Amino acid sequence: MAVYTDINEIELGAFLRHYDIGTLTSYKGIAEGVENSNYLLHTSSGSFILTLYEKRTNREDLPFFLGLMQHLAKRGLECPQPVVRNDGAMIGQLAGRPAAIVTFLEGMWMRRPTVAHCEAVGEGLAHMHLAGADFPMRRRNGLTLPDWRPLWNLSRKCADTVERGLVAETEADLDFLEKNWPADLPQGVIHADLFPDNAFFLGDRLSGFIDFYFACTDILAYDVAVCLNAWCFEKDFSYNRTKGAALLRGYTSVRPLSEAEANALLVLARGAAVRFMLTRLYDWLTVPAGSFVVKKDPMEYVRRMRFHRQIESGAEYGLEMQGVAA
């Protein structure tokens, strides 16, 4: 979460008159994040999150994102729930931006996730996949295999200034992924960005997921692969197999992977590393200093890419055979 668009109390008060959430007592910007502007609201009825959607978020996608949160909450998944306006809509306009209010989710994200946190996230992700199975809307993943080569071409010319040899490495990975990307795996609603800062905990207990603004319809096991990249590498870039095994055990205890999904895990994990390297690399090379967009080091994911090239089976990530459906 972040703040890119400032709002004042007068315009916020006018906006809140369209909601039945009590009287505003205080509000403050939330500094973390990269995509949209977020504020924590305190009212006489409780706490809420106000989001102003910035240019990177397509307004046409908002009904999918908000509808998904509404659907998942109704299915018992802990996540922010959109607050419906007095006119029945979920989206309004504030400071020239589309804006929405969602309920506040208790908890905090873990900067140093433990094995228990990884297992809880895996279990929660599987519950999310099952809860989203009957969600009627679809949204194409705008950052999947067909999109990686065009995105890479925007950065390719300068990539070797970040790391010598990165052009050759990335070209080889893209060639491999384009030849080996799996077809006909189970698909459904995925989070697609379930990093530690998008999962809240109360102690070791998962209290819920947030930030569904990359959610889309895609391969379910790809979501697992994103989590292996996001949760199971240490600060020195080594892969923690114990955390990986816990995350996979948590997931497969709720939704066992098919044999085809298990066999594809190393390709999916390699692809997920490339996806996040490419978006980080693009921002690293193109976003000017002082911009509101928070740049993240692409080399963290280059090192993950190198690790995945050495993997020969899902077992090396910690996948146990009892987690694979017969």
Swiss-Prot record:
Pathway entry: Amino-acid biosynthesis; L-threonine biosynthesis; L-threonine from L-aspartate: step 4/5
GO terms for biological process, alphabetical: threonine biosynthetic process
Keyword Transferase among record annotations: yes
InterPro entries tied to this protein: Aminoglycoside_PTrfase, Homoserine_kinase_II, Kinase-like_dom_sf, Pseudomonas-type_ThrB
Entry keywords, A to Z: Amino-acid biosynthesis, ATP-binding, Kinase, Nucleotide-binding, Threonine biosynthesis, Transferase
A GO MF term: homoserine kinase activity
Class of enzymatic activity (EC top level): transferase
CDD domains, alphabetized: HomoserineK_II (cd05153)
Enzyme Commission code: 2.7.1.39
The family this protein is said to belong to: Belongs to the pseudomonas-type ThrB family.
HAMAP family named among the record's database cross-references: Homoser_kinase_2
Official protein name in the record: Homoserine kinase
